[in-house]
Amino acid sequence: MSAVRPHPVVHLELHTGDREGASAFYADLLRWRTERIDAGCASYHALALGGAFGGGIVQCPARRPVWLPYVEVDRVDEVTERASRLGASVLLEPREGPTGWRSVVATPEGGEIAFWQPKARHRGWGAAA
């Protein structure tokens, strides 16, 4: 039997209607440092977790704040297609960014999860191995 490599959570994003308040709360509570980054259409507060950036806080019209985990995969297109076959709804089709490819799906139970395929020069921080 061959071993299957587990897919680690490598990035966390908080989607909230109060980015500034959330940034202050987590800075005070957990000493998470935030850095504002211009992401084109909106600013993004990157989170320094354990000395490296591994998350972010995004301003969005949310009924309630939601944490979105990004799971590293080998082939984002294949995993997104497999999730769809298993009953997930694709919220964001696989797309390329500066450091990799990502997609987002809603699970059959209504949760959301993002898939991340890094480019060779970029590796996630590995929050959970």
Spans of model-derived segments:
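N-terminal beta-strand motif that seeds the catalytic metal site of vicinal oxygen chelate
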Residues: 1-23, 67-69, 118-129
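Vicinal oxygen chelate
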Residues: 19, 70-112
